[in-house]
Each structure stands twice: as C-alpha cells, then as structure tokens.
Design a protein with these regions (language model features):
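A short beta-strand motif characteristic of beta-propeller blades
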Residues: 30-37, 71-77, 116-122, 162-168, ...
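Beta-rich, blade/repeat-based domains predominating
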Residues: 37-54, 79-106, 123-142, 147-150, ...
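Secretory targeting and sorting signals
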Residues: 1-20
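C-terminal closing repeat unit and adjoining cap/tail of repeat-based domains
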Residues: 235-290, 296-310
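Blade/loop signatures of beta-propeller domains
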Residues: 20-30, 58-61
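A short loop-to-beta-strand structural motif that recurs across blades of beta-propeller domains
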Residues: 63-65, 106-109, 151-154, 193-195, ...
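Short loop/turn segments that connect beta-strands within beta-propeller blades
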Residues: 67-72, 111-116, 156-161, 198-203, ...
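Beta-propeller domains
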Residues: 56-74
Length: 310
C-alpha cells in the first residue's frame, strides 16, 4: 500500500480526490466477478496455498488472516504494525510489517502454519512492501520508506539467513512478480512504470510499461505462463492487463475503491494473485474496500501462472 500521504500526489494525477475514470483502455468483456469475503478491513496483500485457501494482511487493522475454501475469515495474528506483503512457502507464511512511506522501521516475519509460532527474521527495514518467493526459495521484498536512505529491493535466504539489504537499488518499488522464464522479475515504482529486472543483473532494470499506455498507480502484480502481467491499480481501483512485450495495457475491471464518505485516496486495489478455481484458474484481488474478489476470465484467456508452485 502507498501511505495516505500520497493523497496529495494523487491529486496531481487526477482532477479531484475522487477516483477519476482511468484513461487506460478497457477490456472487461467476458470477465465474471464474484465476492469471496467482504467487510474485513483495508486488505493490503494476499497469497494462495494452492488448495483454495488464502492468507491476507490488513494494513490499517494490523492483522494476518486466513480465508478458507468456504470464505470463512479468521484472524491469525493481530496488533501488527502496517502488515504488507505475504507469501506461502510450504509449512510457513512469510509476511512484512512497517509498510508506508513514513512508517517506523519494519520487519520480515515467519508464521508456522501448524503451530502458530512466529519468528522475526529481519528488523529495521525501510518501509517494506511487496514480497516474492523465488524458485530457489529466496525472498525478495520492495521498500518505499523515505525516513532513511533508499534501500531498493532486498533479498533474504531463509535456508541460511543470508541477507542482502540492497539487491537492486531501483527506488520506491512496490509490487513484485516472477516472469515465466524464471530468470527475471517484474516490479513497479512511484514513477508509475513497470520494470523487468534480470535475476543475474539486478542493477539493470528495463522499463516495459508506463504512461501514456498505462495510467495507473501500480501496486502488486502477477504474471501468466504466456507473459501477460496483471497489475493492481491503487488509484482507480482497476486491474490492468499488460502485454510485457509491447507495453500495451487495458483494464479488465475498474472502480474497486472505498464507497462515498469512507474514501481516503489512494484506496483502490492492492494485490492480485492467480490461484486455482476448480479445474481452472482465476484472479483473486484484494482492495482497500475490505473485499477479496474472484475474477474469472473469458474462455480465450489462459491464466496458467508463471510461478511453478501455483
């Protein structure tokens, strides 16, 4: 999530504090939207266990929660300080705290699913935000804090505890996704652009999408096997579909923002994951309006995820 202090900056992008219609082209035909759970606070991030269940974070209410296959919502941890990115890895759920431009120093923590035990792995992080599990088991996380010198993207190896504070120095980054080749990742930052970063050359990011093709305040994201990227939009409450080869983009849904008097822009969508939906795949989306939604694609769209563990 981008801290509320970004509201002033958003006003420079949109005519008013209310969400204006995105100028990104629309491609919503054929997509079906349903609700998994609603009314559970400001949802910041999610991940799937691959078996119809999800782990979500609530940034304002400070929780890590579980959503089962029937939609039953249960808080597992409370009292967390601005929890953000979350990833399931075997018997563990990794998550970040301290998300925000001016938040207090944050942490990377590990929750053991079987016992509920929590282990603090890293402290003193500079506004940690997005989290990604790599095929080799390492974790990448983005940082957006401005209270200290920029730290870019960090890398942590759970098997040994090895930590690289600045794996990539690309600043003010947010979402993360693995590319289907397994040799690069995607990320975005406050310049409103999306980048590809080779895993073997983290200081060589290449911008692949942005204004004018994509007008967005990009948040978390996920890629498909065919290298299509789906990106949450924190400004307009959209999910944008991005062609990573050309930079062309379109919105499959918009307007997922807080209603009326509860608005506090930016307050749109925050994360998107591809997860099983019966024998097929669907997008699952969190938003600041407290709803976890399922987006089923048209028949001609293959959502097979890039991430092998899905």
């Amino acid at each position: 999530m981008l801290a509320v202090v970004l509201a002033a900056g958003l006003a420079a992008v949109t005519p008013t504090a209310a969400a204006a219609p995105t100028t990104t082209p629309q491609c919503a035909d054929g997509w079906q939207v349903s609700t998994v759970v609603e009314g559970v606070g400001n949802l910041e991030n999610l991940d799937s266990d691959g078996a119809g269940r999800f782990y979500v974070t609530g940034i304002v209410d400070g929780f890590l929660a579980h959503v089962d296959s029937t939609g039953r919502f249960e808080k597992l941890l409370t009292g967390l300080d601005f929890p953000a990115g979350v990833r399931v890895a075997g018997p563990y759920v990794y998550f970040l705290t301290g998300d925000g431009l001016t938040a207090a120093p944050g942490t990377l923590q590990r929750y053991e699913i079987a016992t509920g035990a929590v282990t603090e792995l890293l402290t003193g992080l500079n506004g940690p935000n997005g989290l990604l599990l790599l095929p080799d088991g390492d974790l990448l996380f983005t940082t957006i804090g401005v209270n200290a010198p920029q730290t870019g993207i960090g890398r942590y190896r759970p098997s040994t505890g090895e930590y690289t504070r600045t794996w990539s120095s690309l600043p003010l980054t947010n979402g993360l996704a693995l590319a289907p080749n397994g040799r690069s990742i995607y990320t975005d930052n406050l310049t409103m652009r999306i980048f590809r970063i080779p895993l073997d050359a983290p200081e060589s990011p290449v911008a692949i999408a942005g204004i004018p093709n994509l007008v967005t305040l990009p948040d978390d994201m996920e890629a498909t096997r065919s290298d299509t990227l789906f990106v949450a939009d924190h400004a307009f409450g959209a999910i944008n579909k991005v062609d990573t080869r050309t930079g062309a983009a379109c919105a499959i849904i918009t307007g997922l923002i807080k209603p009326g008097a509860t608005r506090n822009p930016p307050d749109g969508t925050t994360s998107v994951r591809i997860a099983p939906d019966g024998d097929s795949w669907a997008l699952y989306v969190t938003a600041m309006d407290g709803t976890l939604r399922r987006l089923r694609p048209p028949a001609d769209i293959d959502l097979t995820p890039a991430t092998p563990t899905r």
